[in-house]
């Protein structure tokens, strides 16, 4: 097999989830549902065993959706970064909030803590990441360097702190959490019981997405905005190594 890349345009696409026959994409103001149109044994253009076609879009408004998942009931659950909460689509409104960090006193379109990552376990939300413990408009920006949090959704407990711009937590089979400590330029594993963390890999770009497949971590790296990483530790690490940042998909063997 080989990697096949096909580009399709969605305005400010960030969140992505799927179950084989369905893909859900979060864009600037909508959640798009794409369905596979091929049956068993069918191929498109004699090469592809999936053909995803847009079938529905739900208007959320400007929620800055960073990540989403499909829960055990088949609902789309998404990280509503603008309103600092987890949410589901609403038939009447743009969304219905279902959870928020306990330090958020009001759900307002103010991106207070930059809630951005969601880990599901057995079809329910398990962990989230936030860039900083803040309860004011854009308050997270003062915590970019070392203020990041990994939070247990069920208990509101902080599992890990002193992270830098954390993203994309994922629960491993042993119960530990694999995630991107993006500002430090690392893929890390966190023990949710004791909080101990270990570096799995160092990254040559800003990590923004992570998936697990058959013992492999598949992650995406971004280049800096405006030519620099804004003083993050990642920038210092790359300079010290004499390495230029890359925009790439990286596959890491976890076995």
How would you describe each model-predicted region?
Residues 30, 85-87, 146-149, 186-188, ...:
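A short loop-to-beta-strand structural motif that recurs across blades of beta-propeller domains
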Residues 33-42, 128-145, 220-243:
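Short, conserved, GDST-rich strand-edge loop motifs in beta-rich repeat architectures
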Residues 41-61, 94-113, 132, 157-158:
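Surface-exposed loop and turn segments in beta-propeller and other repeat-based domains
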Residues 165-242, 247-250:
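Loop/turn-rich, solvent-exposed surfaces of beta-rich toroidal or solenoidal domains
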């Amino acid at each position: 097999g080989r990697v096949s890349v096909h580009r399709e345009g969605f305005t400010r696409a960030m969140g992505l989830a799927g179950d084989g026959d369905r893909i859900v994409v979060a864009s600037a103001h909508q959640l798009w549902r794409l369905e596979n149109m091929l049956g068993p044994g069918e191929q498109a253009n004699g090469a592809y065993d999936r053909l995803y076609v847009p079938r529905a879009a739900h208007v959320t408004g400007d929620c800055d959706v960073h990540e989403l998942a499909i829960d055990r009931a088949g609902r789309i659950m998404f990280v509503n970064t603008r309103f600092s909460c987890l949410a589901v689509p609403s038939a009447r409104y743009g969304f219905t909030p279902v959870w928020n960090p306990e330090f958020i006193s009001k759900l307002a379109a103010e991106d207070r803590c930059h809630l951005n990552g969601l880990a599901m376990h057995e079809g329910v939300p398990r962990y989230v990441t936030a860039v900083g413990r803040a309860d004011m408009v854009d308050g997270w920006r003062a915590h970019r360097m070392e203020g990041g949090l990994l939070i247990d959704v069920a208990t509101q407990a902080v599992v890990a702190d002193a992270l830098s711009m954390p993203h994309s937590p994922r629960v491993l089979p042993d119960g530990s959490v694999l995630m991107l400590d993006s500002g430090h330029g690392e893929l890390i594993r966190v023990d949710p019981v004791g909080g101990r963390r270990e570096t799995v890999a160092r990254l040559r770009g800003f990590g923004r997405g992570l998936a697990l497949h058959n013992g492999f971590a598949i992650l995406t790296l971004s280049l800096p905005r405006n030519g620099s990483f804004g003083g993050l530790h990642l920038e210092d690490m790359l300079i010290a190594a004499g390495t230029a940042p890359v925009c790439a998909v990286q596959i890491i063997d976890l076995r």
